[in-house]
Amino acid sequence: MAAVSAAGLLTSCKEKQDPEHYNIVFIMTDDHTAQMMSCYDNRHIQTPNLDRIAEDGVRFTNAFVANSLSGPSRACLLTGKHSCANGFYDNTHSVFDFSQQTFPKLLQQAGYQTAMIGKLHLEANPEGFDYWEILPGQGDYYNPVFITMDGKSHSEKGYLTDIITDKSLDWLENMRDKEKPFCIMIHHKAVHRNWLPPLKYLKEYEHRTFSLPHDFHDEYKGRRAAQKQRMSISRDMDIVYDTKMHHAGSDTPLTSTYEAFISRLDPEERKEYDAFYNALTADFMSRDLKGRELTEFKYQRYMRDYAKVVKSLDDNVGRVLDYLKSEGLDKNTLIVYTSDQGFYMGEHGWFDKRFMYEESMRTPLVMSLPSDFNTRGEIDELVQNIDFAPTFLELAGIDVPDDMHGVSLVPLLEGQHPEDWRKSLYYHYYEHPSEHMVMSHYGIRTERYKLIRFYYDEDFHELYDLLADPHEMNNLYGKTGYESVTDSLMNELARLQEKYDDPVRFGADKAGNVR
């Protein structure tokens, strides 16, 4: 494991700048997990530019999301509230209500220039931004369509991660009033499924054999929700859509979707793309893999393509960092890098997210701080994506509304360790039944324990001791000797549900409807 040194977190003794002068550059990716970021875990790949942010600032070791799904996570970010309060529960039925309070609106009202570029995925056009240009839905990796503020759509030629960065740098250089503070939200589609890499990196990592997670062949003993999921690399990863093994006669559930995606490449791009993947496909077809060999082949293809997309992402983060430094903006700018949630890289034999288990609830979070913050190293307190909104508001000198669920991270950025800092986090995932068939569930995570209640067509609990069982393989709920721990966690769960006014505390029927 590679990590930024935790030696001696320091608190600045300097007089801070007038808060109105702090800028905010918020870079968020989709499904980028800490396992594939070398300042967190250097087993797989190197991410030198992302690591630069941590080296120049802080790395949060216990950063989590409140609902591990793209749209709901983004709603939590904007509002500083859990899904039960912001109204965006899932990606299938929810539409975000932009008439509600969001931190960009409050920044805008205080004189900040605000911009949003890239993936929004909230089924509504953004409000609270002086400038925005967003993707429709998930967007496309190649030659993508953008929606502009006039409501029109247009295509852009190129690779999406490059284009979003180009547009962001153009706004920073040419479109903002340089006399005013700003907040720009740079939202990448990368590293979302199905991990289409840029042409220049097609051959990267092709000679790398990635090690299997120790629980890759997990049998899910004692964990009923894990048994019911549909996100298994072995069973559910599509050989065409996900691994690009596309050949004449291909007929998988997602073959037509894959063909639509790659149809966006122009003839020259398609020629290079097909030459690469057709050769891999021919080799794959000649091997006639089955069983565990096929599953492990799919894992290697998944890891290689995911790593290629991350490499492109890291390059583009470096472009933003270089620009900010060249313009002297790094000295009074908070630079944040995070993901909308974590992701499974073969742990438990899975891809995707959704579960409250560690790999998907946890998210990478690094920040490069304005020059008058001297704090460097690791921050170990429990933090959550509902904390971004109050943090940005306090940094801008704006009063944090009382109805926000999150808490400002500014004391932690100043090197403090408040004694009254939260000791537990609340989580609630709603989307079921859905594509990956992860049951609706809620729960709490403390420093040591995690308690989860699954509900819908079944109703049961799981309990994990994260110190003794960090990979969450041994469900302790109902086991002798854990009665006191369970009671304490149940009480804390009830307290948080009341605090956040989650109506699920009044019960849910077998159809998953809150009552």
Predicted region positions:
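Formylglycine-dependent sulfatase
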Residues: M1-Y455, D459-H461, P470-N491, R495-E498, ...
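Residues forming the ATP-binding cleft of Hanks-type serine/threonine protein kinase domains
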Residues: L467
